[in-house]
């Protein structure tokens, strides 16, 4: 059985497996709680036991299971039904279930492979002039040139990002006026790097590479583990910077109408 709930607590979420999906769910909960319509939580229950939690933040679905719990084929069938009703733009879940779910909803979704990376520190923080508290409009100006989904959602992006930054759940970095990177969450001692971009006229000059390495060393010095995800064509790039592959998963993305 899968049912929506507003009784999620931090204690409940602490019982989930320690992975990216759990940290994503926690970051949403810690940012907004359970009182907003744009953030919904569901419990997966089998044989009277809670086996997992689902969050749907705007149009992104995140799924994680409790420690020592697994999802049966019947639970995945029911999950596919929930997906068909909600039709999220993106679905992320543990690697052991991603392709199984895709086999059930593949008519509406594409399945893309990702590699998860962890930063390997050399304990050498470069001397760089990085703005750790940039104006978010300056960050947006750069991101908008690389991410159409952000470009077309300025108010939503600004509201959510500033909300999370104020609560210490996210942070943006700016190198000069040309390269930026954002920490998408800082949860349970892990920082997830995402949304790295450089303005077109400065690309190819290794700005993003230098900023990512600096962020890795800076956050490691503060005691955080630094992670990021990359699609197959970017794997060697992150390995060269100093990131080590630690896992693979599959992300489901809803097909656009003309596919």
Regions found by a protein language model. Give the residues of each.
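Conserved acetyl-CoA-binding loop-helix of GNAT-fold acetyltransferases
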Residues: 71-82, 198, 204-221, 230, ...
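Conserved active-site tyrosine of GNAT-family acetyltransferases
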Residues: 101-105, 237-239, 243
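Conserved donor-binding loop and adjoining core beta-sheet/short helix segment
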Residues: 27-87, 177-195, 200
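Acyl-donor-binding surface of acyltransferase catalytic domains
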Residues: 58-61, 65-129, 249-255
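Active-site rim helix/loop that mediates acceptor-substrate recognition in acyltransferases
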Residues: 20-41, 46, 148-172
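Conserved GNAT acetyl-CoA-binding A-motif
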Residues: 85-95, 219-231
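A mid-sequence, solvent-exposed acidic-amphipathic segment
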Residues: 137-192, 197
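Short amphipathic alpha-helix that is part of the acyltransferase structural core
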Residues: 1-26, 112-156
């Amino acid at each position: 059985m899968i049912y929506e709930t507003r009784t999620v607590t931090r204690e409940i979420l602490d019982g989930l497996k320690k992975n990216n999906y759990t940290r994503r769910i926690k970051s949403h909960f810690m940012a907004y709680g359970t009182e907003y319509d744009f953030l919904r939580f569901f419990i997966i229950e089998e044989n009277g036991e809670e086996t997992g939690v689902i969050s749907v933040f705007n149009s992104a679905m995140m799924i994680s299971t409790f420690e020592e719990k697994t999802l049966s084929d019947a639970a995945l069938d029911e999950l596919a039904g929930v997906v068909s009703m909600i039709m999220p733009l993106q679905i992320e879940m543990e690697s052991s279930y991603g392709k199984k779910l895709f086999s059930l909803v593949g008519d509406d979704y594409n399945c893309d492979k990702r590699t998860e990376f962890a930063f390997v520190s050399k304990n050498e923080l470069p001397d760089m002039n990085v703005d750790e508290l940039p104006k978010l409009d300056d960050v947006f100006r750069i991101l908008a040139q690389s991410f159409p989904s952000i470009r077309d959602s300025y108010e939503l992006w600004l509201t959510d990002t500033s909300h999370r930054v104020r609560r210490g759940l996210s942070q943006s970095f700016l190198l000069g006026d040309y390269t930026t990177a954002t920490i998408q969450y800082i949860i349970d001692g892990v920082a997830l790097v995402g949304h790295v971009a450089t303005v077109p006229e400065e690309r190819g000059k290794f700005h993003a590479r230098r900023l990512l390495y600096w962020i890795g060393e800076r956050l490691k010095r503060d005691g955080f583990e630094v992670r990021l995800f990359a699609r197959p064509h970017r794997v060697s790039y992150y390995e060269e910077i100093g990131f080590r592959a630690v896992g693979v998963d599959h992300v489901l993305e809803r097909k656009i109408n003309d596919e």
